[in-house]
Amino acid sequence: MELSYFHVAKDVPSGIKPETSVVIDVLRATTTIACALNNGAEAVQTFADLDNLKEQASCWPLSKRLLLGERGGKKIDGFDLGNSPLAVTSNVVKGKRLFMSTTNGTRSLERVKESKSLYTMSFINRKAVAEKLISNQSKSVLILGSGWEGAYSLEDSLAAGALASFLLNKNPNSVHILNDELSAAVALWSCWENNIEGCLRNATHGKRLERLGNHDDDFTCCSELDKICVVPTQREKGVLCSL
């Protein structure tokens, strides 16, 4: 298995259509997606463009849809929910389609939507995603972070390193790292694997969330490792389900 990692969507070379992609947005989109599907959401449909989201959502009955998203870490005016994984409880999301747009994560999903297989990952479902890649015998995997407004993020690289380290430990002779970005992410993981939440709080996006208010419970949730077994999978372009 060949692994490569790119910090943000714009770093992915043009013309690439990956066989398999894994999108990461630890704080907080891919954590929220995993939690929503784990709690029974019918699907999470992602959008980079808000007007497109509203148009598509209008085709669904009010009782079967939720608008979910943030800009700058704050809930979008008029939306049902923001981007907290704690808000997507079973009694709120079960059986519903979530229409989601975030500052960073949905851009990365848009960039690799042509992938043959597309998954989303955070710390909370790292093992499940890694085992899915192994069981699928994926030959080439592009791991894509989301960053913050087009710039590098510490927490996404930490998660990329966590995924690569798991795969390397499982199959050291058949997993190959193709770029320095991922080698650096693996090294970062070796430094912080015993204090994930500490790394998230030290990251600039973590500090940004702290300035917006008390997000202690979000930090705790986003730093939990291998807690749930859901693998958010693109069923059709832009639509993620638990398959």
UniProtKB/Swiss-Prot annotation:
Single annotated GO MF: 2-phosphosulfolactate phosphatase activity
Keyword Ribosomal protein tagged: no
Pfam families: 2-ph_phosp
Broad enzyme group: hydrolase
Matches recorded under PANTHER family: 2-PHOSPHOSULFOLACTATE PHOSPHATASE-RELATED (PTHR37311:SF1)
Family from the record: Belongs to the ComB family.
Protein name: Probable 2-phosphosulfolactate phosphatase
